[in-house]
Structure formats: C-alpha cells, structure tokens
Amino acid sequence: TIMYRPTFNFSKGNSNSGNFSETLNNESTPINRKEATNHQTNDRFSTNGSLQLNRKLNSKGRNIALRLYYDLDDGNSDRYSLSNTYYLKYGDSIKTLNQWIEKLDKNNKYQVQITYMEPVFTNRFIEINYSYQHRSSLSEKYAYDWDKQEDTYSQYPDTAHSDCYKNKYSTHQTGIFFRTIRTNYFYNIGIE
C-alpha cells in the first residue's frame, strides 16, 4: 500500500502603517516626539506532506512500514521604514532614520520512520520502530540606510540593525513494544 498526501500554500501581501509617540516631563511639557511610517510587502510559500508505504509479509500479521514526512516553509519581506525623532529638551534637534529592511525566513523539517511488526502468539505482536528527525531554521535580516549623496539605499547593510542566525538539530528515536489486539480491547507495553 502506498499513500501520499501533500499540501501547498502561497500568499502575498502588503501593508502600510504609521505611528506617533511623545514623551513628557513632570510638567507635561514635551521633551521628544517620534513619527514613523512603514510600507511592507511579503510573500510566503509552504508545503508539507507524508508518504507511507506498507508491505504485508504474510497472512499472520508480519508487516513492515515506512513513513516519510516533510514540512517546508519559506518567507521573505521588504520593509521601507522612515522615522523622525524630535528632541525638544535642549533646543530643537532631529534624528532621521530611513531604511530598507530585507528579511528572509526558512524553516525545514523532515522525518523518516520505519516500523516492523512480528506475530509471536495469536493476536499478539512485537513491534520494533526507529525514527530520525531533522530540523533547520534560517533567519536573515539586512537593513540598508538611505545614502543622501547617492540618492538611494546603501549597498552595504547597517550592522547595528541587521542580524542573522541558523539552527540545526537532529533526533534519533527507537522503541520496542509488545502489543495485544482483541475484539473489545487492545494494549501496548514497551519502551522507547
């Protein structure tokens, strides 16, 4: 028996936002205020699925099964952020931050599981299984400052506002079980 069940998803979107904040002193006099606007576009693709193969080896219940599972998720976005911070306490001054922020996210997972079942008595079986799972994640964010001289965003990222990380890990798991199957009940005893 072979069964394969995949799913796919794709999405696109964009958003605009703005905010205003103000800091006051004890006399309720503004000491600074901040105005910010953001425009963002993003798209994401994800897919997952499972493939299962079952092989019956005899009529008494001996069989072997293989199951493969995967889950993949990729997303990226572009955000244009402009903020002006006005410092009012010691005379008027302004700090402007104009950035293009590029972000990438990847999350992957796959698992392989094999199960063998051997009949030992009537309606009683020994099951042995093994599974291997691997996960990985990647996140990259690069922020590019506006270059007034070039009248465009810098080709080099601003390290103070950029970051990236990558994680990987794997797990192995095995187990053995004694299984009893009756018309009105069943039970498992085992370790893994």
Q: What is each stretch, according to the model?
A:
Residues 1-192:
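Primarily recognizes Gram-negative and organellar outer-membrane beta-barrels
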